[in-house]
């Protein structure tokens, strides 16, 4: 129900903002085959009517191939031809066409997120209308109770003075939107709302001036109060969807140390890095752009790229991607891509594309709303004319028309979905699950396939020592003494999971990409990967093993081998059982090695497991399933899962996930147990049932109430009471969801079988 608004500053900008064709062409990106993509920011896009208006306007340009509006990002993505019949096209016309449609467009540039002023304004408007409505109602009670004429007139004037500023301040969202739509030859949901509120106040003021017995100031203010609640909920939930992309953008480094050809170094912004530039990356810094290692050796956290739970060693000629964290040594990197074409930018683009796809759910509702507006106006007009010409009482005709407009106000319809979402979100929160996206529950109820990431989702994401093959009794003590000097995940797991008292070393050196080295007299001890500890001729045992291996050596001869795996998340087995029992298909999509993924799938009884997937391949798998008509719930935790979380029909992440993973997900569960997934699906299905009931109640109310209003049997006051009552009924029905989890018959059937204690080993 959110619609277009424009202020005077925006209107002025339409006539002053201009870009040359060359500026626009430089701001767009080549796609090949003579096509370019242009991204534009359009801040005043708010509803499905805005989307269809802009897209239709752009597609009238002969050189525009596709146009898509992302409602969440308030961005327009346009693909256009560079040439038509050997003549260059003018892409600046794209901005002009958007401006002509009544919207302010400018070239998109990433920037830090600003505070949500619209949300604050909406909350303040709710407070103003919420203060005015009950106070006017209290005055109305005295009038209804039979106050004398002088007291009645005084109360009416007081009500008028309270209602006027409330209507001006709280109603400006609807009035501006309605005016903007009408002056461009369109209607939207705010048009009948604005007409209803204005007519109700005008008729009430007329009655007050002429000492009438009744006034309906409370009706107009109450309408605004209920409608603003629905609009605010919609706005808050939509803006939360942007948090993931903002967080991912903050992950990218802002600058890098450039190595000049003469060997000197200077710090430059990431945007200034060109392909072929050499940059220095110290330990603890993130890789700013995609590139190839020129010199140096280090361990990188590549979780953003592959989802690997363990750091990966890189050396000369290794390819690295932007966003990876350099853990140990210094590197010199030759850039192969500029920042806007790097992996991080690609992930952000994938997430925005997925969010744009979600807008179709809102479009369906807004398209229905475009039909509602003219029908309501026509109904009120016909009622007015019929009563005026047939009855001859034009005052009564006006009251009937106002009553029809009030009684058909979409308050109940507007609250049918958001109120259930809020109650369901509260119920899930009590279960340790947070809902972040307004449409997430609706989409979760439609789920028929659940795709899990492995590391950090099905498992806890922390390494666990599972086996030690020692050739020397003191090996564990030596290894623990060495491992205590490193923050490597496997070193920490070794220290945590061994109980032997460590042997102390005076000096321990950490070799980037290799491991730890220490001397004890004439002996050299090494702990790390096989090649580092024993030389390149040593053959590790992890090639086809589900375990990670660390080798301890003395003077190049192995003393012990330590094997690590990941622990299954508590409740993982029960969760898979319950999902299977509910008829949902389960699969694993992971960046880990296929052998490791297969091992976890076998432990959980999951038939389909895909390993060694990149973020893009995870997205493609979700899209493939969507193409087959499946409704995919993606459950993941890593930064590399963020695009798939955004591309899936709906997504969940544990609270232990990366910041980006949590922000990209529609739902986040704070409990350690994985049975939060079937719990959430159970509540979502129940809430979907209540939403359908609320729609039935709201439609049933209109079917019964509209004929009564047309017949003149309902005054504007009665119409306002009926409208409020319908809203209360809808809210009360939604509250039935409270305590849902306490009724065992509502739960997804629990599977019987494997114990939660089954391990991944």
Curated annotation (Swiss-Prot):
Task: Name the residues that span the membrane.
Answer: 121-142, 156-177, 185-205, 218-238, 368-390, 396-415, 692-711, 717-735
A single GO molecular function, which one? ATPase-coupled monoatomic cation transmembrane transporter activity
Which reaction equation describes what this protein catalyses?
Answer: ATP + H2O = ADP + phosphate + H(+)
Q: How does it sit in the membrane?
A: Multi-pass membrane protein
Q: EC annotation? A: 7.2.2.-
Please tell me whether the keyword Chloroplast is annotated for this protein. no
Asked whether the UniProt record includes Protein biosynthesis among its keywords, one would answer no
List the ranges whose topology is Cytoplasmic: 1-120, 178-184, 239-367, 416-691, 736-761
* Summary of the function given for this chain in its UniProt record: FixI is a pump of a specific cation involved in symbiotic nitrogen fixation. The four proteins FixG, FixH, FixI, and FixS may participate in a membrane-bound complex coupling the FixI cation pump with a redox process catalyzed by FixG.
Q: Which stretches face the Extracellular side? A: 143-155, 206-217, 391-395, 712-716
Family, according to the entry, reads as follows:
Belongs to the cation transport ATPase (P-type) (TC 3.A.3) family. Type IB subfamily.
So where does a metal cation get bound?
A: 47, 50
Report the source organism: Rhizobium leguminosarum bv. viciae
Which UniProt keywords are given for this protein, alphabetically ordered? ATP-binding, Cell membrane, Magnesium, Membrane, Metal-binding, Nitrogen fixation, Nucleotide-binding, Phosphoprotein, Translocase, Transmembrane, Transmembrane helix
Q: Which GO terms describe its biological process?
A: nitrogen fixation
Top EC group: translocase
- Read off the InterPro entries from this record: ATPase_P-typ_cyto_dom_N, ATPase_P-typ_P_site, ATPase_P-typ_TM_dom_sf, ATPase_P-typ_transduc_dom_A_sf, HAD-like_sf, HAD_sf, Heavy-metal-associated_CS, HMA_dom
Start and end residues of each HMA domain: 36-106
Instruction: Identify this protein by name.
Output: Nitrogen fixation protein FixI
- Where does the record say this protein resides? Cell membrane
**Source organism's superkingdom?**
Bacteria
Entry's Gene Ontology cellular component terms: plasma membrane
At which positions is Mg(2+) bound?
Answer: 637, 641
Q: Please list the residues that make up the active site.
A: 453
């Amino acid at each position: 129900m959110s619609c277009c608004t424009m202020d005077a500053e925006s209107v002025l900008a339409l006539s002053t903002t201009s870009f040359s064709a060359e500026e626009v062409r430089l701001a767009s990106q080549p796609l090949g085959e003579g096509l370019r993509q242009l991204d534009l920011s359009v801040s005043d896009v708010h509803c499905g009517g805005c989307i269809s208006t802009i897209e239709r306007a752009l597609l009238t340009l002969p050189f525009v191939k596709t146009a898509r509006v992302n409602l969440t990002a308030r961005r327009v993505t346009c693909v256009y031809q560079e040439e038509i019949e050997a003549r260059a096209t003018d892409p600046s016309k794209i901005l002009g066409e958007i401006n002509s449609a009544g919207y302010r467009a400018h070239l998109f540039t990433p920037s830090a997120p600003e505070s949500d002023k619209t949300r604050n304004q909406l909350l303040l408007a709710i407070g103003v209308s919420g203060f005015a409505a009950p106070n006017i109602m209290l005055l109305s009670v005295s009038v209804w109770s039979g106050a004398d004429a002088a007291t009645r007139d005084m109360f009416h004037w007081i009500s008028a003075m309270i209602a006027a500023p409330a209507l001006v301040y709280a109603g400006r969202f609807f009035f501006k939107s309605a005016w903007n739509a009408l002056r461009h030859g369109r209607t939207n949901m705010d048009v009948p709302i604005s007409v209803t509120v204005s007519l109700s106040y005008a008729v009430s003021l007329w009655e007050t001036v002429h000492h009438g017995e009744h006034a309906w100031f409370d009706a107009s203010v109450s309408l605004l109060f209920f409608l603003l609640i629905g609009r605010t909920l919609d706005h808050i939930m939509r803006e939360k969807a942007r948090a993931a992309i903002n967080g991912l953008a903050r992950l990218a480094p802002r600058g890098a140390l450039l190595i000049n050809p003469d060997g000197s170094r200077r710090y430059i912004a990431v945007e200034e890095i060109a392909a072929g530039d050499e940059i220095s990356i110290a330990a603890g810094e993130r890789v700013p752009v995609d590139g190839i290692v020129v010199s140096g050796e280090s361990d990188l956290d590549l979780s953003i790229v592959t989802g690997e739970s363990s750091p990966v060693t890189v050396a000369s000629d290794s390819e690295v991607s932007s966003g990876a964290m350099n853990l140990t040594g210094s590197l010199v990197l030759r850039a192969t891509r500029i920042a806007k074409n790097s992996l991080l930018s690609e992930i952000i683009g994938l997430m925005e594309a997925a969010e744009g796809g979600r807008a179709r759910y809102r479009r369906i509702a807004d398209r229905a709303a475009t039909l509602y507006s003219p029908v309501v106006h026509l109904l009120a007009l016909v009622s007015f004319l019929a009563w005026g010409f047939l009855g001859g009482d034009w005052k009564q005709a006006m009251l009937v028309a106002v009553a029809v407009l009030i009684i058909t106000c979409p308050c109940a319809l507007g609250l049918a979905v958001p109120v259930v979402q809020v109650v369901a979100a509260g119920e899930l929160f009590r279960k340790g699950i947070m809902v972040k996206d307004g449409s997430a529950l609706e989409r979760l109820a439609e789920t028929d396939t659940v795709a899990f990431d492995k590391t950090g989702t099905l498992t806890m994401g922390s390494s666990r020592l599972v086996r030690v093959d020692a050739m020397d009794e003191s090996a564990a003590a030596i290894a623990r003494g060495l491992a205590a000097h490193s923050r490597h995940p496997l070193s920490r797991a070794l220290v945590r999971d061994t109980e032997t008292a460590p042997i102390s070393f005076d000096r321990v050196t950490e070799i980037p990409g290799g491991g730890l080295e220490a001397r004890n007299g004439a002996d050299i001890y090494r702990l790390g990967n096989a090649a580092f500890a024993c030389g390149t001729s040593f053959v590790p045992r992890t090639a086809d093993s589900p375990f990670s291996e660390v080798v301890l050596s003395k003077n190049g001869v192995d003393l012990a081998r330590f094997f690590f795996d990941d622990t299954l998340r508590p409740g993982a087995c029960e969760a898979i059982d319950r999902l299977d029992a509910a008829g949902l298909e389960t699969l694993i999509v992971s960046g880990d090695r296929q052998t490791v993924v297969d091992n976890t799938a076998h432990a959980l009884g999951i038939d389909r497991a895909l390993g060694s997937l990149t973020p893009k391949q995870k997205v493609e798998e979700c899209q493939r399933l969507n193409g087959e008509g499946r409704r995919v719930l993606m459950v993941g935790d890593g930064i590399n899962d963020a695009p798939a979380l955004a591309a899936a029909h709906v997504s969940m992440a544990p609270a232990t996930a990366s910041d980006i993973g949590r922000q990209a997900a529609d739902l986040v569960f704070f409990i350690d147990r994985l049975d939060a997934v079937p719990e959430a699906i159970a509540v979502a299905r129940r809430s979907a049932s209540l939403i359908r009931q609320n729609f039935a109640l709201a439609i049933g109310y209109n079917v019964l109430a509209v004929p009564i209003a047309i017949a003149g049997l309902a005054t504007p006051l009665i119409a306002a009471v009926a409208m409020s009552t319908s809203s209360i009924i809808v809210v009360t029905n939604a509250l039935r969801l409270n305590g849902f989890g306490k009724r065992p018959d509502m739960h997804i059937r629990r599977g019987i079988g494997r114990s939660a204690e089954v391990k991944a080993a």
